[in-house]
Amino acid sequence: GFFCVSTSYRAEPNPVEGRHETIFPMFEFEMKGGVDELKKMEIELCEYLGLPDLEIETYDDWSNKFNTKELDHDHESTIGSGMITDFPEWTSPFWNMARNEDGTSKKIDVILGGMETIGSAERSTDKEQMRNTFYTISDGQYADLIIKLFGKERVEKELEEFLEFDFFPRSG
């Protein structure tokens, strides 16, 4: 695998004080292996750092515990230390994330100190699924924005060039 440390800039539409920063350090990693290897590594990382055991539940199980459809920052605060897995499609998982047979994404959020601290997922190897979700996530608004910014010809050319790669199970 490999990693990098960079600075991230993000303009959240409705920032929560103390939770959303416009500029923050970002530690990113990519590793060989699917979501099971990813989950194992993240659990081992938390153990190595001496953090409390994580309560691990799917998105639907967490939302059922809180009697809600959508998890928000108040729910994450209540979770404290935990892991949210298997995100439903309506949460708009990124287009290159792998999907389970039930349509949920192979995505993991690690909640530490009541906040999403690690956001990770298995990358897809299914070229048709990636092409389709590129155009359909967030009701098509993501693709529309990228096309508006860079032009349809360039976006479609670069998407098709990306999809020509030979993909293998990886996550980050």
Describe each region flagged by the PLM.
Residues 1-172:
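A translation/RNA-centric and nucleic-acid-associated enzymatic feature enriched
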